[in-house]
């Protein structure tokens, strides 16, 4: 599969920038004639993968959403050498289609949870597996792997195009969660079809419950055989990533280029990560790399940034020394040296150029900003490629001779600029591809104040990063009500210098001072800061939000008797925790949307990553259970939930509100029928934001 420059424009269109032509943006439907101004007629088409020979590409349309990331769609193989002739690879919608590196095969899954392979030269389909059912998943994620490991396709082609490795998940022992939906089509609501709710069921392991059993299989494309890899006997937990090492050159005349299968394993508590190398012929695996933390979880996501070099070495990312840094390991898994001994977190790796021996990456120079860097490993010289406060991201061409820089900040929308390599580590600006000046002018015409970043020192002496949006027509001699927005989840960040125009600006336009504070546990401030909330989610975050609110009350333009806190999902949980922990009336009201209310009710992978299992951390679960704090809630409350939420089940809100009733607490509640965790149905989303405004007007 060819690595192209991928450009995500502000309206969400995936396009290609042809590095050789440099001057043009090429739309994914017609790579020879269409420019950025001609995209509107083909917005329904999306590019999935491209073959390394540039002849074929996959496109899909008619997307049918499944869960957060997964979807079924009609996939087409496009032959650029035959006038972009399109061939549908299956007569039914499929998911997670991926093209082999040489463009001769496409692997995908169908609704029966089996894997299939389409042979391009013969235009034929062959079933790779046939044993799947509603509890067996071959090569694709179940709900848990998709939601908490951010992956949908659990398979990978070998670099020689001869084998497909895949993860097999068996959910047979996983408990089932069920919910109902109530709405039929408008015309059918009072017919027989709409008289009875529909029941939906999902295998959903809550904290401490049995997980799916995972195994690794390898399919030989020529012989149509499947082998199961022999994992060590103590391998319990998760297998969220598989890949292959690059082909190595043979040392003898009769040898063929070889590649190892690479398997990432996490134990159940996710505080130990093992990387295995496996021989698909013998099925034997051996340990290549292991990392364990006694104090926290091991960040498996860093594995996605590892760079496997053609000579067998690998650039490993780890936060084992306090910050996310890069290390060079040899082919035997022995550390050779630290590549980036800096006190800042690497946030993304763009890749490694073997010709210049340069590693390109993004790092948090400050927690609120992102800069891009080039590290010449041979010379041990690091160069910052970007300038200016804000967020910088790079998209490189396959030959590492061009990149598109995407820059944005709180005052600058996404601007895309093409750069060209000039040699000796120097880059020259070629042209601004897209500046979104019209969007900037339209935004400025609204007259809304921009975010201002400022520090808050807590009562215990920690310095928290925060931003504020002053009310429209701000007058420093007046006092204003405050709405504190927050998410607060572990490793997350909301205080970032980026172009993120959300609901907070509408609140500022309505006359509120809007503030967001990142407390302990949030990202880009090193391992120890992220460690702070381990085993007791919500407690220290609430301490920080309360301390920040007390500071805001001291400001001359803040009305300390009119303050609110609001959050969604983890932020909703944190809102309830804050209203339960405030010993004095810091906030007069709060809004909790789709909140977790007890970590025993949430899924195993996320919860146990930060809390471990209830069986080993009973005190942590008891001490963060909001049901047990219902009697401590102070201030007015609006609690909101979608009744078809497959992620944070409405069960959380319903059990919690029962506890509030038993404690004699009055509150407001808004339920959205047949809507999920995001409450994305247009009429519901509009209603929700109006409801928030009305609640704040009433209580502040």
Give residue spans per PLM region.
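Beta-propeller folds
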Residues: 7-11, 17-396, 401-402, 412
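General helical structural elements
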Residues: 6-7, 374, 524, 695
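Positively charged n-region of N-terminal signal peptides that target proteins for export
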Residues: 1-4
